[in-house]
C-alpha cells in the first residue's frame, strides 16, 4: 500500500504533468471507484482546471476551479499520464481526458481505491480527511502522548491507526519501531513522554528520507512508471538479517498486519 512518502512522490510527479491542464471529459470504466453519484462527479469536475494537488496523510486532493476531489490509492492505485491513443490497460478504471490531448488514467489492480468530491476551501474538515490524526511532522508531543497513553494497542498497531497519526503504514511502522529499538508489541500506553518525543522525531526523519528517495518501490508502487529508491535503505521490512547484529529477522503479524 502506498504510504505517505509514496503518495507525496505521486503528488509531486503528477504536478509536473497535469498542473494547469483542463479536464475535458471523464470516462468511468469501474464506477465503484467514485463514491459520489457518477453524473454529479462528472458535471462538477469536467471543464475544470487542475490548479494544484495537495496531500494529507495517504490522500491526494486535486484542487480545481470551483471544487476539489480526494483520491485514496488504497492498496495498489496509481496514476499514469499517457497519450490518448495508448491502448487501455485492463486495470485502467477512471480516465481523465485533458485539454492537451493526453489522459490521466487511474489504474488499480485491486479496485480498492476511491475518489470523492469535497469542497475547495474546507476539505480538511470534511470526511474522509476530518477523521485523520496529524502527520508526524506536525504532531504535538503533548496531544500525541495523551492519545497513546489511553491506547492499549501494540505500538505498531497504534502507528497504523490513521486517526492517531496519519500517513504511516506497514513499511514505515516497522522501520520506526526498529530505529527506536522498540518492541512492536509494546502497549502504546507504556510509552513515556520522552519516548513519544523521540517517536515523532524518528518518524519524521524516516518519512522525510523516504520522500527524498522517491518512496519505497515494493510490489506495484511507482509514480508514473518512476520507481522509488528507499527500498535499498530499509533496515527490517522484508529483510532477512538484522543490520546491527546479523541475527535472523522473524516475521509476525500484529493485528493482521
Model feature map: region roles:
Residues 22-41, 46, 54, 70, ...:
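Basic, nucleic-acid-binding surfaces and adjacent catalytic neighborhoods in DNA/RNA-processing proteins
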Residues 1-115:
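Surface-exposed binding/hinge segments that line
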Residues 65, 69-167, 172-173, 177-179, ...:
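Phosphate/anion-contacting hairpin/loop surfaces
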Residues 3-6, 10, 19, 37, ...:
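Alpha-helical structural motif
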Amino acid at each position: 500500500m502506498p504510504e505517505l512518502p509514496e503518495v507525496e512522490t505521486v503528488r509531486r510527479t503528477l504536478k509536473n504533468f497535469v498542473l494547469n491542464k483542463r479536464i475535458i471529459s471523464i470516462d468511468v470504466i469501474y464506477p465503484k471507484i467514485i463514491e459520489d453519484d457518477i453524473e454529479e462527479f462528472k458535471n462538477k469536475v469536467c471543464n475544470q482546471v487542475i490548479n494544484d494537488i495537495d496531500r494529507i496523510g495517504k490522500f491526494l486532493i486535486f484542487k480545481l476551479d470551483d471544487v476539489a476531489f480526494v483520491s485514496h490509492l488504497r492498496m495498489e492505485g496509481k496514476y499514469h499520464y499517457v497519450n490518448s491513443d495508448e491502448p487501455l490497460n485492463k486495470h485502467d478504471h477512471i480516465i481523465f481526458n485533458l485539454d492537451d490531448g493526453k489522459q490521466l488514467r487511474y489504474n488499480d489492480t485491486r479496485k480498492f481505491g476511491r475518489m470523492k468530491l469535497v469542497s475547495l476551501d474546507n476539505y480538511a474538515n470534511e470526511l474522509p480527511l476530518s477523521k485523520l490524526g496529524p502527520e508526524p511532522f506536525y504532531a504535538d508531543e503533548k496531544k500525541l502522548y495523551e492519545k497513546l497513553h489511553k491506547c492499549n494497542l501494540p505500538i505498531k498497531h497504534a502507528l497504523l491507526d490513521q486517526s492517531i497519526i496519519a500517513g504511516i503504514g506497514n513499511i514505515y511502522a516497522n522501520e520506526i519501531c526498529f530505529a527506536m529499538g522498540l518492541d512492536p508489541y509494546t502497549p502504546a500506553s507504556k510509552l513515556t513522554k520522552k519516548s513519544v518525543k523521540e517517536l515523532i522525531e524518528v518518524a519524521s526523519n524516516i518519512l522525510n528520507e523516504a520522500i527524498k528517495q522517491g518512496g519505497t518501490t515494493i510490489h506495484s508502487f511507482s509514480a508514473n512508471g518512476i520507481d522509488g529508491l528507499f527500498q535499498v535503505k530499509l533496515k527490517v521490512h522484508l529483510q532477512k538479517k538484522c543490520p546491527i547484529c546479523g541475527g535472523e529477522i522473524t516475521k509476525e503479524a500484529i493485528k493482521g498486519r
